[in-house]
């Protein structure tokens, strides 16, 4: 039987189940330019409305993996574990856990992207380090993974190229918010990345893509199933993003804070999430070791320094600092009971730390430092946050975005746990 895009669209439009052959054909034909953009847009909208069965979704994800190369990481001499975060405000966990897990005997290959809107991108953060580069050849990537044990690089076009085309189309057709499509987008790249195991960190709350636990849990279960079906050991942690993670939000500010954790210090909340993620990553590849001592004794810091140097960076070079700062103060005395992650992330973006469009440049020094954290007692007029920017008008925009981010009350409230659930 000859397959056509119209037949595939009609089947899903009417609530039918696509065959593996139909799924493989339509994604291969779309990637090869034989299915028109408007036809794929129609199919994506049908998927949003009708969903995909577990079998369909497994076939869809497999076809996305098959659209490109699958990395061979078998020559590293170590068990290989990858990590993915759904993104949040102040989420610099990858900067800590990649060298930390590598210091304990695993190999950590991390292909990362750039930030858009209020959430930062790992590449943007690392590019605040003088000389650091993320564009590595396949040979450079693999050599560093073997020699150092950890590498964070820019994702190229070779892995799951169908996903890159589909995501661009979803972005302009209102078909981004679909759990099957989100799950297949993430997992196709992770499966193609070639790791033995993957730890997923799905953020939940005001500053996250998934605002509620039920949706996050559904996404987590879907991704774990896709990874397992593909032979990749997969576990997901649901972690809170109601408040920013750590105190620094912005590229250079987050690198500095990650280095504090690697020195054995840093904010308690960031340290807690990093250790929880690292424990799961190690367990996935059969390494039964507590990661905390590797932060205290400098082993993780040593791998960080080697990782940065291997990619042209100088770990001891001063990070960029903002030309202008402004302190935001408390209007009343009391306990900090809420810090709105979305408002803080938006403030950092407007200060210059993020971008509205993919082609925008970022200011590596811009961002927000939270001087008062959840549960802290503050006096009226005491500092809550410091805004960092390159231009005065940026400070005004950041100040406006941050207005109302802090709730201060007479009595403290119990803080919610940072690690909400484990799936897998």
Over which residues does each language-model region extend?
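Active-site-proximal beta-alpha loop/turn segments in soluble metabolic enzymes
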Residues: 44-48, 125, 163-172, 201-210, ...
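Short beta-strand segments
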Residues: 111, 145, 153-155, 186, ...
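Phosphate/diphosphate-binding glycine-rich loops and adjacent basic-rich segments that engage nucleotide
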Residues: 146-195
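A glycine-rich helix N-cap at a beta->alpha junction
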Residues: 125-151, 221-227, 231
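Alpha-helix C-terminal capping segments
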Residues: 49, 95-109, 189-194, 229-230, ...
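Well-ordered secondary-structure scaffolds
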Residues: 7, 12, 17-19, 30, ...
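Acidic, glycine/proline-rich low-complexity segments that act as flexible tails and inter-domain linkers
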Residues: 1-90, 306-307, 419, 424
């Amino acid at each position: 039987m000859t397959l056509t895009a119209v037949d595939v669209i009609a089947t899903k439009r009417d609530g039918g189940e696509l065959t593996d052959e139909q799924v493989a054909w339509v994604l291969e034909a779309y990637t090869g330019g034989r299915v028109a953009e408007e036809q794929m847009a129609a199919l994506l909208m049908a998927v949003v409305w009708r969903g995909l069965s577990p079998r369909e979704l497994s076939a869809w994800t497999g076809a996305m993996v098959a659209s490109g190369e699958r990395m061979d990481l078998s020559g590293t001499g170590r068990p290989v574990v990858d990590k993915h975060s759904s993104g949040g405000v102040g989420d610099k966990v990858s900067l800590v856990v990649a060298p930390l897990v590598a210091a304990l005997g695993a190999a950590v290959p991390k292909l990362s992207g750039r930030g858009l809107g209020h959430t930062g991108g790992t590449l943007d953060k690392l590019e605040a380090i003088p000389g650091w580069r993320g564009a590595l050849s396949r040979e450079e990537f693999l050599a560093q993974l073997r020699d150092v044990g950890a590498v964070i690089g820019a994702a190229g076009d070779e892995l799951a190229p169908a996903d890159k085309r589909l995501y661009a189309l979803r972005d302009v057709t209102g078909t981004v918010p679909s759990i099957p499509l989100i799950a297949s987008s993430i997992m196709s790249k992770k499966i193609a990345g070639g790791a033995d195991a993957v730890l997923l960190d799905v953020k939940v709350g005001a500053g996250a893509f998934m605002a509620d636990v039920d949706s996050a849990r559904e996404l987590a279960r879907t991704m774990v199933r896709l990874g397992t079906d593909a032979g990749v050991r997969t576990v997901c942690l649901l972690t809170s993003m109601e408040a920013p993670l750590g105190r620094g939000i912005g590229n250079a500010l987050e690198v500095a804070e990650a280095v504090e954790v690697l020195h054995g210090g840093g904010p308690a909340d960031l340290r807690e999430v990093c250790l929880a993620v690292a424990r799961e990553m190690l367990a996935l590849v059969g390494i039964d070791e507590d990661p905390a001592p590797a932060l205290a004794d400098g082993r993780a810091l040593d791998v960080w320094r080697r990782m940065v140097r291997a990619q042209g960076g100088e770990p001891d070079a001063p990070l960029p600092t903002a030309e202008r700062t402004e302190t935001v103060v408390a209007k009343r005395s009391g306990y900090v009971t809420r810090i709105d992650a979305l408002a803080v992330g938006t403030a950092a973006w407007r200060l210059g730390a993020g971008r509205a469009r993919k082609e925008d440049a970022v200011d590596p020094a811009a961002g927000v430092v939270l001087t008062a954290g959840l549960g802290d007692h503050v006096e009226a007029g005491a500092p809550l946050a410091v805004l960092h920017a390159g231009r005065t008008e940026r400070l005004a925009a950041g100040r406006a975005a941050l207005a109302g981010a802090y709730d201060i009350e007479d009595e403290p409230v119990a803080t919610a746990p940072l690690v909400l659930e484990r799936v897998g």
